[in-house]
């Protein structure tokens, strides 16, 4: 198969994510590679590598921002935030439960967060994590509780946007429970969580995690959103836009932006499964310039229209995900 013989996007051969560990899947010469994103994994694992240059990073930022804003910065009436509304005192000041970019330059998640911080431009935004000596991501509990408690006392009416891995939220919630703290963040505050629990002894079902976020932080369940992304991609999926209260018990369906496409592939037949059936998630990402456009993941999902319901890693697949970086 060659580019000349491909007449439909579904015919593009997909490269497995595991190939990024062994091969340099880029058209960039070594001298032009100014950045590289690594997959998150155990210290014994060889990480995936996604190489970038200034031009590809510009496409990455251009890709992530409108879909992020569409899903996380929408107003209560469903309208999207205007460019002016994403800056200044009226915007949700983001708090990132990760180390800052300087400490983890190979994290695509933290690069994404820094892009969001720059786009929003809120002076109150902060990275409240740090890199431990063993390479794990730790939370600076003094910094995060000071930021959150200050706003729960309504010294500012600005709603908050808290972003982090699932396990970073577990760390934070455990700390708040230990200190018997319950915060009530300003109305309209939102949470974005991502990643899983592989290689962690403490796990929480999604609904329990979100219930605890509501209990300890005062963020309404319908304002808690999940993100799906990986270092090999340049676009992200979100489990629908901010949910109306009547929908929170329905399956959480992830959708990629319009410049990406999705298939759920049967591991037995190699063909796309029918609606409602389970298979491996395959993603076609036009934002992946200078790299591979079609990615075959090892994640299981249920086909839901143009989106998918995420089930988790396929059996025998290597554990990965940014939550692995949280000790």
Placement of each model-derived feature along the sequence:
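Active-site glycine/GP-rich loop and adjacent strand/helix microenvironment
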Residues: 76-79, 90-93, 100, 106, ...
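Conserved adenylate-forming
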Residues: 40-75, 92-101
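Short polybasic/polar patches that bind polyanions
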Residues: 21, 55, 215
């Amino acid at each position: 198969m060659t580019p000349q013989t491909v007449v439909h996007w579904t015919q593009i051969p997909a490269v497995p994510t595991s190939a990024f560990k062994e091969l340099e899947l880029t058209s960039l010469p070594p001298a032009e590679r100014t950045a590289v994103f690594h997959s998150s994994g155990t210290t014994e694992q060889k990480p995936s590598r996604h190489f970038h240059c200034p031009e590809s990073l510009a496409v990455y930022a251009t890709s992530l921002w409108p879909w992020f804003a569409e899903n996380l910065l929408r107003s209560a009436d469903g309208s999207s935030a205007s460019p002016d509304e994403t800056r200044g005192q009226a915007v949700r000041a983001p708090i990132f439960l990760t180390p800052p970019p300087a400490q983890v330059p190979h994290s695509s998640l933290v690069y994404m967060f820094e892009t969001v911080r720059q786009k929003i431009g809120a002076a109150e935004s902060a990275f409240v994590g740090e890199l431990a000596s063993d390479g794990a991501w730790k939370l600076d509990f003094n910094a995060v509780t000071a930021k959150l408690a200050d706003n729960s006392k309504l010294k500012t009416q600005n709603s908050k946007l808290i972003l982090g891995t699932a396990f970073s939220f577990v760390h934070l919630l455990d700390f708040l429970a230990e200190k018997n703290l319950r915060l009530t963040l300003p109305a309209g505050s939102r949470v974005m969580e991502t990643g899983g629990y592989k290689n962690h002894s403490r796990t929480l079902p999604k609904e329990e995690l979100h219930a605890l976020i509501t209990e300890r932080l005062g963020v309404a369940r319908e304002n808690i959103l999940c993100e799906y992304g990986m270092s090999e991609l340049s676009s992200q999926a979100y489990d629908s836009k901010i949910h109306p209260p009547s929908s929170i018990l329905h399956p959480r369906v992830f959708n990629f932006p319009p410049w990406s496409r999705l298939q759920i592939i049967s591991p037995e037949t190699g063909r796309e499964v029918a609606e409602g059936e389970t298979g491996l998630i395959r993603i076609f990402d036009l934002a992946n310039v200078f790299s591979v456009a079609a990615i075959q993941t090892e994640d299981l999902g249920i086909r839901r229209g143009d989106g998918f319901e995420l089930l988790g890693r396929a059996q025998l697949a290597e554990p990965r995900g940014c939550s692995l970086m949280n000790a």
